[in-house]
Amino acid sequence: MQKNDDLLRERRKDEHVALGVKQNEQLAPSSLEDIQLIGTSIPRYNVKDIDLTTTIVGTNVPFPLYINAMTGGSRHTKKINAELAEIAREAAIPMAVGSQSAALKNSSLIDTYKIVREINPNGMILANISPEVALQEGLRAIEMLEANALQIHINPAQELVMQEGDRSFSHWLTRIEEYVKLSPVPVVVKEVGFGMTRETVKTLADIGVQTVDLAGKGGTNFAQIENDRRRDQAYDFLLDWGISTGQALIDMQHQDAPKIAYLASGGIRNPLDIVKALALGADSVGMAGQIIYSLKKEGVTKTIEKLELWKEQLRGLFVLANAKNISELKTTPLIISGELAKWGALREIDLVKLANRK
């Protein structure tokens, strides 16, 4: 029985990657397209003046992008994790591994995650677990990678679509609070592509969580992945569940939103998307599916070159926004239009204030 469970988990990991890459071949319209920065025609700064450094859970990093959790737990994904670790090392960006539950249940899979630290010995690495994982097991996940931080992913929609997924969730908040109090490294609570509302963020802030990853709809769709894995595909009605990254970011502009650090991920496609997310308060921006897609189609070297180009392009966008650093970018005026503006108005977000901030 244990062997069958292990094989099922390994197959699931491989299917996640294959289906995730397929999704990224043709991207749907993004809610971030409804966000427009108000720039300048007479910049105050030169490109060389721009400072892209940011802080993630107390660690200073030189560029506001990280490789978000996606994979690990099978022979095939070990190779992918090794290549992602090389990209993270050469581009000097943090990296999160995929859920480590497989390795916690089957020690023969530990190396599929540990390879990340072997290839990137000095980089910022985030371990990744579910709130189903008991504290002592979670500490093993941190040790496995000598991790700098711990991601706890919350994914009820994915679990419900997954035939072998969890069906009990009421203990999650207590478990997360336990990690916040006892983890030897900082904790980031992240969604997996269904987005966090400000109410969810407040619930987490109330138990001591200091950083969340809003992880909205628009990137890899795990409801679709799990539904595609089912023979009956019985959950096709749930494929559009959740809020987009743009909606999650706008929701955090409400006057009652908790004042904690947040990261943004889900449907980030280019440097302009990064700038928009940072301008709406994110400290850094995560990508998973698009980086794996680039890796699969173009290889490690081309993906690193793309990220280096993005750094230069990002500096140019900061110049156009009249912002020397991320702190200044967060005061840049923004116009919210289209469906995102309608959604924001219904959520009582002061869009006029956003459009006229200084």
UniProtKB/Swiss-Prot annotation:
- The organism's superkingdom is given as Bacteria
Positions of FMN binding: A69, M70, T71, S99, N128, K190, T220, G267, I268, R269, A288, G289
An example of a Gene Ontology cellular component annotation for this protein is: cytoplasm
- Where in the cell is the protein located? Cytoplasm
Which key words are in the record? Answer: Cytoplasm, Flavoprotein, FMN, Isomerase, Isoprene biosynthesis, Magnesium, Metal-binding, NADP
Q: Which GO terms describe its biological process?
A: isoprenoid biosynthetic process
* Main enzyme class: isomerase
GO molecular function annotations of the record: FMN binding; isopentenyl-diphosphate delta-isomerase activity; magnesium ion binding; NADPH binding; oxidoreductase activity
Q: Which cofactor does it need?
A: FMN; NADPH; Mg(2+)
Assembly information from the UniProt record: Homooctamer. Dimer of tetramers.
Database matches in NCBIfam families: IPP_isom_2 (TIGR02151)
Q: What's the stated role of this polypeptide?
A: Involved in the biosynthesis of isoprenoids. Catalyzes the 1,3-allylic rearrangement of the homoallylic substrate isopentenyl (IPP) to its allylic isomer, dimethylallyl diphosphate (DMAPP).
Provide the protein name: Isopentenyl-diphosphate delta-isomerase
Name its species: Listeria monocytogenes serotype 4b (strain CLIP80459)
Q: Which gene encodes it?
A: fni
